[in-house]
């Protein structure tokens, strides 16, 4: 789900043996470090090479046939895997992750089926990202119309703004319906079989759906997503005590609503409710609001998004019991101290929204048939999304993507994981770098981030022995932001001054959710600051906020560029370019930290090609 924080579970590391067939044919074990529900804390490399070295042995990834795994199969009486298959790939769950995997699978020539027990689109399309953005679009326009000072600064005069609740709700519902139909039609158009019914794993390479339908596939992907997490002691009636599923229907706009949890979900709904006239009270178990964000960004966001609005908050407390409104009585919330568990306060409000994160939807999937034991409900997987059984061994031909594995509970992360799995089953090794996946909170202004927070980066630097630097730029110095009268905001980058590696970027300001992708792509490609600061940005645009950010970074003079030369040669001849493609300069490149593995790329050439392409296009237009 795009706007859902992972549950606040402590991060736990597990080391499991991974049995792999070596080049000599012998089976050897190599430790595999696994982490569950570690939002933004997993750093996996991105490998496109045809060979992967493990210890002194080499595993060949030249084709699907040469990539073999020794794994324990189920012995629960389900028998051996079938010799022939109905499909190349079966996907259980037709959310954003399953949809992305299905489209990529057909592109790779795989006969594909997708099973859905509810409606196509999953949480994101029907009860998450899509309808919430529709509501936030309304809240953004309401805020602008209600801000008399802001409108006068443009020379505009606007009468009092109002809204029709049902009309707003219809806008969100209609958008969800449209996107759901688009997803369904896109799969039908390319020949994906959409099977209706609850799907479960019956055994190795075997799936059951509906009452008694059994089908087989070479590979199976579990993509069942998540549901709202409701702590014990909270009674949800769907009317006065609600989850995000209910809130998105906007059946009412209460005068006073308590929001339990101040992560992505809670923060976005506070934006909607306050714009529509509600008073909001946050209840947060930790000592500060917005605990999942970079601390500096959290403080600024609180100053802009919380303090000036009709919002108060209680931090360091649990809602131990919430009783819905009934018999003319309001919603009753009992608060206790998060540390001592002593009673703290009692609140009486019109409604309460439970925004305490999401829990994996993995019950009833038949995981016991392949000896898989969940971890807090999450299905354990390795860095290639391969499912791991209770003995720490890979389950053959079984993968899990998205919220169900807990690696990064975002819709686009699920889609990326699905595409990564399809690459693997098609014969090309692919490991997704989760630190390059951006996240965004669509408040007004927006918040976005990619990579590590400042505390996380400094902790990593201390452990691995490198220095961490921080640089910031302000939206108040950006021409486009000032033209929009939206100068409130900053961009912040955490990086290594010794080699120019970008460790994290955080943005708070106008269209932050759109701006973050330049930084996320830089991290994904391993682009160094000394390279990307030479890129040209159109003026005047908001993208110049990042342009100034990159230029403000101080990289040590001895740090080399990605091509191994501190002086970028823009006028390189064809032979020089061929030499670089052959990898002649690769040996000179500085090593990237082990959490962000290098891939062969030349950012300077990329920007040169883009510039040449743009100039060529312009010449065609104006000649």
Curated annotation (Swiss-Prot):
Catalysed reaction, written as an equation: N(6)-[(R)-dihydrolipoyl]-L-lysyl-[protein] + NAD(+) = N(6)-[(R)-lipoyl]-L-lysyl-[protein] + NADH + H(+)
Cofactor requirement: FAD
Gene3D superfamilies membership: 3.30.390.30, FAD/NAD(P)-binding domain
Chain intervals for the UniProt region annotation (Disordered): 561-597
Function (record text): Lipoamide dehydrogenase is a component of the plastidial pyruvate dehydrogenase complex (PDC).
PANTHER family per the UniProt record, alphabetical: DIHYDROLIPOYL DEHYDROGENASE, MITOCHONDRIAL, DISULFIDE OXIDOREDUCTASE
Name recorded for this polypeptide: Dihydrolipoyl dehydrogenase 1, chloroplastic
């Amino acid at each position: 789900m795009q706007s859902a924080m992972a549950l606040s579970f402590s991060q736990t590391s597990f080391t499991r043996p991974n049995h792999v067939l070596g080049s000599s044919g012998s089976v050897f074990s190599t430790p595999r470090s696994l982490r569950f529900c570690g939002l933004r804390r997993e750093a996996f490399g991105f490998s496109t090479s045809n060979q992967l070295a493990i210890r002194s042995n080499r595993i060949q990834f030249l084709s699907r046939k040469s990539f073999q795994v020794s794994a324990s199969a189920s012995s629960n009486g389900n028998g051996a895997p079938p010799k022939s298959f109905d499909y190349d790939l079966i996907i259980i769950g037709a959310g954003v992750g399953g949809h992305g995997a299905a489209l990529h699978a057909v592109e790779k020539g795989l006969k594909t089926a997708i099973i859905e027990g509810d409606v196509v689109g999953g949480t994101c399309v029907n009860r998450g990202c899509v309808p919430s953005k529709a509501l936030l679009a309304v809240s953004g326009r309401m805020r602008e119309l209600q801000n008399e000072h802001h409108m006068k600064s443009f020379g505009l005069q606007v009468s009092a703004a109002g809204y029709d609740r049902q009309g707003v709700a219809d806008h969100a519902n209609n958008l969800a319906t449209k996107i759901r139909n688009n997803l369904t039609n896109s799969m039908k158009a390319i020949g994906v079989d959409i099977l209706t019914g609850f799907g479960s794993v019956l055994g190795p390479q075997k799936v059951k759906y509906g009452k008694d339908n059994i089908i087989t596939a070479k590979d199976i992907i579990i993509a069942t997503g998540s549901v709202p997490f409701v702590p014990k002691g909270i009674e949800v009636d769907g009317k006065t005590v609600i989850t995000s599923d209910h809130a998105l229907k906007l059946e009412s706009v209460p005068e006073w609503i308590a929001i339990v949890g101040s992560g992505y979900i809670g923060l976005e709904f506070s934006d909607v409710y306050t714009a529509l006239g509600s008073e909001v009270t946050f209840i947060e178990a930790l000592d500060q609001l917005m605990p999942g964000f970079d601390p500096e960004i959290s403080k600024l966001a609180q100053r802009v998004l919380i303090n000036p609005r009709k919002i108060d908050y209680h931090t360091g407390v649990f809602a131990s019991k919430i009783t819905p409104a009934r018999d003319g009585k309001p919603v009753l919330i009992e608060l206790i101290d998060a540390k001592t568990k002593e009673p703290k306060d009692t609140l009486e409000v019109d409604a309460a929204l439970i925004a305490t994160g999401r829990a994996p939807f993995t019950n009833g999937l038949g995981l016991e048939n392949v000896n898989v034991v969940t971890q807090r409900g999450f299905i354990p997987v390795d860095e290639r999304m391969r499912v791991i059984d209770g003995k720490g061994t890979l389950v053959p031909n079984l993968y899990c993507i998205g919220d169900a594995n807990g690696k990064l509970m975002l819709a686009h992360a699920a889609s990326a994981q699905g595409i990564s799995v399809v690459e693997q089953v098609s014969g090309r090794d692919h490991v997704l770098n989760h630190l390059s996946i951006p996240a965004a909170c669509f408040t007004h202004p927006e918040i976005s981030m990619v990579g590590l927070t400042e505390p996380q980066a400094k902790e990593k630097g201390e452990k691995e022995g490198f220095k961490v630097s921080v640089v910031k730029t302000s939206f108040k110095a950006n021409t486009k932001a000032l033209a929009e009268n939206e100068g409130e905001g900053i961009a912040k980058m955490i990086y290594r001054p010794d080699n120019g590696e970008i460790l994290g970027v955080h943005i708070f300001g106008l269209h932050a959710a759109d701006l973050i992708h330049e930084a996320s792509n830089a991290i994904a490609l391993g682009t160094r600051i000394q390279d990307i600061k030479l890129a040209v940005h159109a003026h005047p645009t908001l993208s110049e906020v990042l342009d100034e950010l990159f230029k403000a970074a101080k990289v040590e003079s001895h740090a080399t560029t990605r091509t191994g030369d501190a002086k970028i040669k823009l006028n390189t001849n064809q032979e020089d370019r061929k030499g670089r493609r052959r990898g002649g300069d690769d040996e000179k490149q500085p090593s990237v930290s082990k959490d962000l593995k290098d891939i062969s790329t030349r950012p300077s050439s990329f920007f040169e090609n883009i510039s040449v392409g743009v100039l060529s296009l312009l010449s065609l237009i104006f000649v």
